[in-house]
């Protein structure tokens, strides 16, 4: 599922709804906020769900700047500092990243973790564009929520 435009009601996870509302707040009446408008201290409980990528042009490439702990756990590795194309299984992901750079609006995606050893898991990705010059996307923030199976050892007895 690839949905745009989106409203907060379209987002099923509380963590991603909170991140979307915060992005809207710091955006104000602009097309998109600057990365400097985002202060991690304003949303500390959301940090494990955040991925931040730099957008490079000529040629267009994406570099993982920051990866939250929920994503490193889902991937079973940390790809901070690496380029998107160096991670196997990310061709479809690059299409969505190109889309947000060109369209400059948020989107919601639901799919399988084809870029992870845990490709059987479902996840949600909330893409949020950021711009230093107010016109061009130079960073993308993703809120990522993984549909991890419940571990029977962690479920309290009934």
PLM features: what roles do these ranges have?
Residues 1-158:
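Intrinsically disordered, low-complexity terminal regulatory regions
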């Amino acid at each position: 599922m690839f949905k745009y435009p989106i409203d907060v009601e379209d987002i099923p996870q509380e963590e991603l709804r909170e991140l979307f509302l915060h992005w809207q707040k710091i955006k104000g009446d602009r097309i998109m906020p600057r990365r400097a408008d985002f202060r991690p201290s304003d949303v500390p409980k959301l940090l494990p769900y955040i991925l931040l990528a730099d957008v490079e042009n000529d040629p267009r490439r994406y570099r993982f700047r920051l990866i939250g702990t929920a994503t490193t756990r889902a991937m079973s590795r940390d790809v901070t500092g690496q380029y998107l194309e160096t991670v196997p299984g990310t061709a479809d992901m690059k299409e969505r990243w190109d889309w947000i750079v060109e369209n400059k609006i948020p989107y919601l995606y639901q799919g399988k973790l084809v870029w992870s050893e845990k490709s059987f898991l479902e996840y949600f990705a909330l893409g949020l564009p950021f711009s230093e010059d107010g016109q061009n996307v130079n960073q993308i923030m993703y809120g990522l929520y993984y549909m991890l199976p419940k571990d029977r050892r962690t479920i309290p007895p009934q």
